[in-house]
Amino acid sequence: METLSFEFPAGQPPKGRALVGVVGSGDLEVLLEPGSPGKLSIQVVTSVNGASLRWKHLFERMFDGQTPPALSIDIHDFGATPGVVRLRLEQGFEEIGHD
């Protein structure tokens, strides 16, 4: 198991919270909660060691050219593909009311 932390510039925190995915399914679970204004914080707990660069690139692609809401995101991963990670994050953003 490996724990990774990332931070990105962000706007204002949303009012909502979201929990998407199921960690026990061999997939991943994503919890999105309002964060500190101006900061998006992501913590990833993953069963895949040595994947920090892959996670970093995934988040950089997702947030490039846009200002995400200020969130605290916790991801519990059990080997999900980058496409599934992005899908779960997009589902979470939709649930909290941010496009």
Curated annotation (Swiss-Prot):
Q: How is it modified after translation?
A: Covalently binds the prosthetic group of malonate decarboxylase.
Q: What is the lineage of its organism?
A: Bacteria, Pseudomonadati, Pseudomonadota, Gammaproteobacteria, Pseudomonadales
This protein's GO cellular component annotations are: cytoplasm
Q: Which family does it belong to?
A: Belongs to the MdcC family.
The organism named in the record is Pseudomonas savastanoi pv. phaseolicola (strain 1448A / Race 6) (Pseudomonas syringae pv. phaseolicola (strain 1448A / Race 6))
* Compartments where located: Cytoplasm
Q: Which UniProt keywords apply?
A: Cytoplasm, Phosphoprotein
Q: Where in the sequence is O-(phosphoribosyl dephospho-coenzyme A)serine found?
A: 25
Q: What does the protein in this record do? A: Subunit of malonate decarboxylase, it is an acyl carrier protein to which acetyl and malonyl thioester residues are bound via a 2'-(5''-phosphoribosyl)-3'-dephospho-CoA prosthetic group and turn over during the catalytic mechanism.
Q: Name one Pfam family in it.
A: ACP
Q: Does the keyword Phosphoprotein apply?
A: yes
Q: Which domain of life is it from?
A: Bacteria
Name of the featured protein:
Malonate decarboxylase acyl carrier protein
HAMAP family listed in its UniProt record: Malonate_deCO2ase_dsu (MF_00710)
The record's InterPro entries line, in alphabetical order, gives: Mal_deCO2ase/Cit_lyase_ACP, Malonate_deCO2ase_dsu
